[in-house]
Design a protein with these regions (language model features):
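Residue-level signature of the transmembrane alpha-helical core
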Residues: 17, 21, 53, 84-87, ...
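Extracytoplasmic
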Residues: 11-53, 61-63
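Hydrophobic/small/kink-forming positions within alpha-helical transmembrane segments
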Residues: 21, 57-61, 91, 95, ...
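Short helix-kink/termination motifs in transmembrane helices of multi-pass secondary transporters
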Residues: 22-33, 58-61, 75, 167, ...
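Hydrophobic transmembrane-helix bundles of small-molecule transporters
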Residues: 161-253
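Primarily residues marking transmembrane-helix entry/exit sites
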Residues: 6-17, 99, 200-205, 209
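Intrinsic disorder in cytosolic terminal tails and internal cytosolic loops
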Residues: 1-8, 191
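Helix-loop-helix hairpins in multi-pass membrane proteins, especially solute transporters
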Residues: 67-202
Length: 253
């Protein structure tokens, strides 16, 4: 038996699927273009790796804090801001004229990605009843793997014929569709399950700093600096967990 979807459900599914496709597609396609980007900006291997690392650092470190902000202020609101940041970041990256600008733009994109991924699945679980969630979550996960699969092929194709900058412009049509749906009447509701609760700024800062230290430490091993960063990250996570256990409105519950 096929369950008839309301416009709200259909719009939410399209928004989640398209946005879940975007980041993996861009990430895997950019990896193909790294040698050409490195040659254009005369970047060594370490600096070149930061095109990917900077994005992943921002996306990973901010995932939990943005998830909490979405619970307090509304998942749709945070998601919408995220897709705007991701899209603007893509345009800025396409016009970057130095390695520094390129890496900063990727950090900006990572911030948007964190806002998208911290809310996308949560929006689906808010819109769809329990008996439908397995199917829609499966579709959503499928879009992630589709992005990873198609990224290298189309990334190579676009880079060869239109240049590496086209990779970032190519995602804009999907982003525009997502933004239009978010602004439409089909996407009713904001889904703020912790509305009115306090956001733990101190805990968030400690968490973000610890995650950045951990990821940076792993990337710099076996250097002494890498080991020190790892140690700082572990201490930071321990401090974060102790702090969160003692407050009434934790970032991670």
């Amino acid at each position: 038996m096929i369950t008839k979807h309301t416009p709200d459900k259909t719009a939410a599914l399209i928004v989640a699927v398209f946005s879940s496709f975007l980041a993996p597609f861009m990430g895997s396609s950019v990896n193909v273009a790294l040698p050409i980007i490195g040659k254009e900006f005369a970047m060594d291997a370490i600096l070149l790796s930061w095109i990917t690392t900077a994005y992943l650092l921002a996306a990973s470190a901010l995932l939990v804090p943005f998830g909490r902000l979405a619970d307090i202020h509304g998942r749709k609101k945070i998601f919408t801001i995220g897709i705007w940041i991701f899209s603007i970041g893509a345009v800025l990256t396409a016009f970057a004229d130095s390695s520094t600008q390129l890496i900063l733009c990727r950090i900006f994109q990572g911030i948007g990605s964190a806002m998208i991924f911290s809310t996308g699945l949560a929006i689906l679980t808010s819109v769809f009843p329990p008996h439908e969630r397995g199917k829609v979550l499966g579709i959503n996960i499928g879009s992630v793997y589709l992005g990873l699969l198609l990224g290298p092929f189309f990334g190579g194709l676009l880079t060869e014929h239109l240049g590496w900058r086209s990779l970032f412009v190519a995602t804009l049509p999907l982003s525009i569709v997502v933004i239009l749906l978010l602004l439409s009447k089909e996407m009713k509701g904001d889904w703020a399950e912790a509305k009115g609760e306090r956001f733990d700024i101190t805990g968030s800062v400690i968490y973000v700093t610890a995650i950045v230290a951990l990821m940076s430490g792993f990337s710099e091993l076996p250097e002494t600096r890498g080991a020190l960063l790892l140690l700082a990250g572990i201490i930071g996570i321990a401090l974060f967990l102790i702090l969160e256990s003692r407050i009434s409105s934790p970032v991670l519950s």
